[in-house]
Design a protein with these regions (language model features):
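Structural recognition of beta-strand segments within beta-rich domains
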Residues: 74-101
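Mature, soluble, non-transmembrane domains
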Residues: 19-51, 69, 102, 106, ...
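Sec-dependent signal peptide recognition
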Residues: 2-9
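C-terminal motif of bacterial Sec signal peptides marking the signal peptidase cleavage site
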Residues: 14-17
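Edge/loop elements at the starts and ends of beta-strands within beta-rich repeat scaffolds
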Residues: 59-63, 85-90, 107-109, 187-189
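A short, Trp-centered hydrophobic/proline-enriched beta-strand micro-motif
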Residues: 52-74
Length: 212
């Protein structure tokens, strides 16, 4: 029961507060060659008026494979769970795990298709919104800036490197002067984490690396 409640809250945070548009479902069908030229076939509404396509995996900044604790909030509700995350320039994979390490849901993205499989969620949930948030944190900042600029939005990134070797990078998405989302990437000796705050949709979550 506990995990069912957590999944319902997670659904509210990442799916039900948003709507999306998939070009495959539009009246204009594209050939595979046209889709390659345009990039991802999935769009995400960052605001109620502006949508952006998902970037392709080749825009991933390096590669990462890690277990993370996900802690989040949506309104007055809070949740926490464990996840496994892998991403490189070919694909992205994410698995949601229970307290015993059992897979309770999985997401994958290879540039052509977003797949989300879980008995806990309806099949029509918008998994591309999870992909978009992950891209905002992990993908190349120049590629993100260009993508948002094409959608009429702005993307900023400021990285601070300390003498200790630790670093903090803050990424922000704006609609004109209105702050839509803020992503903080902390790479420290005691903590490696990503905090995502979406001011428009009213959700926040933090991903903290689990020590090996």
């Amino acid at each position: 029961m506990k995990h069912k409640i957590v999944f319902v809250l997670l659904a509210g945070v990442l799916f039900f507060s948003c709507t999306s548009l998939n070009r495959q479902n539009s009246s204009k069908q594209e050939t595979s060659g046209e889709a390659d030229a345009l990039g991802s076939q999935y769009f995400v509404y960052v605001t109620n008026r502006h949508k952006v396509p998902l970037l392709l995996p080749c825009d991933m900044d390096g590669s990462v494979e890690t277990y993370q604790v996900m802690e989040g909030s949506y309104g007055n509700q809070h949740f926490s769970m464990l996840l496994y995350f892998f991403s490189d320039q070919n694909e992205m994979q994410l698995s949601l795990l229970n307290d015993f390490g059992t897979d309770m849901g999985s997401l994958s993205y290879d540039g052509r298709e977003v797949r989300f499989e879980s008995a806990m969620f309806p099949k029509n949930l918008k998994a591309e919104y999870i992909v978009c948030d992950i891209q905002n944190a992990y993908y190349d900042s120049a590629a993100l800036e260009a993508n948002y600029k094409n959608a009429g939005l702005s993307f900023e990134s400021v990285r601070t490197l300390y003498e200790t070797g630790e670093s903090v990078e803050v990424r922000k998405i704006f609609e004109e002067k209105k702050l839509i989302e803020e992503i903080m990437l902390k790479n420290g000796r005691e903590e490696q984490s990503i905090t995502i705050k979406n001011y428009l949709r009213g959700y926040e979550y933090k991903l903290t690396k689990v020590e090996d």
